[in-house]
Amino acid sequence: MAFDDAALERALRAETKHGLTLYCNGETLTALGYEWMAVVPMDGLRERLRGTLGALVEMLGYIPENDTVRIVRNKGGYLVQPELPETVGEEICGYAGEPHTEEIRPTGLRMGMNFLMQKRNGEIVGVVPRGANLDVRRYAITAGGIVRQEDGDTGERLYRRGYRPREDTDSEATLRKWRHLEVMSWCDWDAPEE
């Protein structure tokens, strides 16, 4: 199982405070959190009866099969509300629907709560770390700023919204720091990916 089971379990539990959406079609489980989405094969989850699957059973009371639900933590436990698959599908398409991607790699740097990643052209993107498994080998970023991680062997995919400062909303100091980072090359693009 290539995905980080403990990290995904923590992300699911943390996300229920604001609301976590689950979409399961029997083969894959798609979890939609705030600014991230993970797609995990159900076969990989069923190999273990604790971790992520244990958290889902605790929240739902059963193993998800063909469900679309929203889970919110309340005082006594978890509130589970059915959702329309069409509504969730629109949100999933917002993450996964963009076909054009560019290669992007982690720099090893952080700014605040964001991990910084760099495109080949030098552009830096901050990525929300929640639920992330930074050991996945291949990364790409869509034109809309969605960072994709993928492991072709297991089908794990994690999508997260990228962040870039904007001249109309961010301070000049933030923009200056960002420009300074983009002048340098933080990734060895000639080295093979591990």
Locate each region found by the language model:
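Intrinsically disordered, low-complexity linker/loop segments enriched in Gly/Pro
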Residues: 1-40
